């Protein structure tokens, strides 16, 4: 399924139904009183969170959405039917903004959460409601209220506990495959991952957490380079960031410089992002070239007070210890300490 995380749509609530002008016409009562019923209420525009959705793709191809119009009132005091509500399902993490002003109208994060964004117009009153002591046969009724309409911009920011960062081809997809049931595309070239992947990690004693594999970020990402800042927003809701580092490219690539570059891009995009807690994860320690350079790189991180964990996504070495550390950050302690 195509991953779409931004759409612009036009939504419109339902117009209220008109009140009815009607008079009783029954046998032996040729001049009965007014019996015009009220019009029905127009449908509302409602957003609801569907946990089974992970993209805004369906809305991309339906840019104009409209709730049902209320039916007009009828004679014999019959009320017009209310218009059908327009219910729009969205994935968890969807932000609804006014497309013109950028105002945030709703932040939808919890499964089942609903918000009424536009109210349908009220139905007009029928002439039966306007009878007075001086006007026993009113020949007028109210029209229904107008509908509301608005252009909206929807943005999806994935809901994950852990954000997985790193330059292209450092092994993020291999890592998420190893620790979860997610199966992202994996190959030995940059930008294999062109959409965020979510993996649920089943931890000890039936606890679990969600990891988001964010597509490779390069220098200039905050300004749109590479896959750009489009995906940086997906780490904003995470509690902790794992920064994967690959030493197998030495000397062609400098892993320390890449680490500093990525953090600079985070800071340029959002100072709050740069301030999130990070764990440095050195991947591919099953390779001789990585083990050779491992001590000096570990020392570099430790000198700066940065937690660092060597692992192999290929063999699984070091991963249980890393998961324990993640658990401490998320829940305050590792499972065996409970």
Swiss-Prot record:
Q: Where is this region: Disordered?
A: 66-91
Provide the alphabetized UniProt keywords: Cytoplasm, GTP-binding, Hydrolase, Magnesium, Metal-binding, Nucleotide-binding
Record Gene3D superfamilies: GTP1/OBG domain, P-loop containing nucleotide triphosphate hydrolases
Question: Where is it predominantly found?
Answer: cytoplasm
Q: Name one GO cellular component term.
A: cytoplasm
Q: Which residues form the Obg domain?
A: 1-159
Record's SUPFAM superfamilies? Obg GTP-binding protein N-terminal domain, P-loop containing nucleoside triphosphate hydrolases
EC number of the protein? 3.6.5.-
Q: Name a Pfam family for this protein.
A: MMR_HSR1
Q: Which InterPro entries match?
A: G_OBG (IPR031167), GTP-bd (IPR006073), GTP-bd_Obg/CgtA (IPR014100), GTP1-OBG_CS (IPR006074), GTP1_OBG_dom (IPR006169), GTP1_OBG_dom_sf (IPR036726), OBG_GTPase (IPR045086), P-loop_NTPase (IPR027417)
Q: Required cofactors, per record?
A: Mg(2+)
Q: Which residues bind GTP?
A: 166-173, 191-195, 213-216, 283-286, 312-314
Set out the biological process GO terms recorded for this chain's protein. Answer: ribosome biogenesis
Q: Family assignment? A: Belongs to the TRAFAC class OBG-HflX-like GTPase superfamily. OBG GTPase family.
Recorded hits in HAMAP family, A to Z, give: GTPase_Obg
Q: How does it associate, per the subunit comment?
A: Monomer.
Q: What is this protein called?
A: GTPase Obg
Source organism of the structure: Geobacter metallireducens (strain ATCC 53774 / DSM 7210 / GS-15)
Name the lineage: Bacteria, Pseudomonadati, Thermodesulfobacteriota, Desulfuromonadia, Geobacterales
């Amino acid at each position: 399924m195509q991953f779409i995380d931004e759409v612009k749509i036009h939504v419109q609530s339902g117009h209220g139904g008109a009140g009815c002008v009607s008079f009783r016409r029954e046998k032996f009562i040729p001049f009965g009183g007014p019996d015009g019923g009220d019009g029905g209420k127009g449908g509302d525009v409602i957003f609801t969170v569907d946990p089974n959705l992970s993209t805004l793709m369906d809305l991309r191809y339906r840019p104009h959405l409209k709730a049902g119009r209320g039916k007009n009132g009828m004679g014999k005091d019959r009320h017009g039917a209310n218009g059908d509500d327009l219910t729009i399902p969205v994935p968890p993490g969807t932000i609804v903004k006014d497309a013109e002003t950028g105002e945030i109208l709703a932040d939808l994060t919890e499964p089942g959460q609903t918000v009424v964004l536009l109210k349908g117009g009220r139905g007009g009153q029928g002439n039966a409601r306007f009878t007075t002591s001086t006007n026993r046969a009113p020949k007028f009724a109210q029209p229904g209220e107008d509908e509301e309409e608005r252009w909206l911009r929807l943005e999806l920011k994935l809901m994950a506990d852990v954000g997985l960062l790193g330059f292209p081809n450092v092994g993020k997809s291999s890592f998420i495959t190893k620790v979860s049931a997610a199966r992202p595309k994996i190959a030995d070239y940059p930008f294999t991952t062109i959409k965020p992947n979510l993996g649920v990690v089943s931890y000890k004693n039936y606890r679990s957490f969600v990891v988001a594999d964010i597509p490779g970020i390069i220098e200039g990402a905050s300004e749109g380079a590479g896959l750009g800042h489009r995906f940086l927003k997906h780490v904003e809701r995470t509690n902790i960031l794992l920064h994967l580092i690959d030493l197998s490219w030495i000397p062609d690539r400098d892993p320390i410089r890449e680490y500093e570059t990525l953090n600079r891009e985070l800071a340029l995009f959002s100072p709050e992002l740069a301030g999130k807690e990070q764990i440095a994860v050195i991947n591919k320690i099953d390779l001789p070239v990585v083990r050779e350079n491992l001590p000096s790189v570990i020392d570099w991180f430790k000198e700066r007070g940065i937690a660092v964990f060597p692992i192999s996504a290929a063999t699984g070495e070091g991963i249980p210890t890393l998961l324990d550390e993640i658990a401490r950050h998320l829940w305050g302690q590792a499972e065996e300490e409970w």
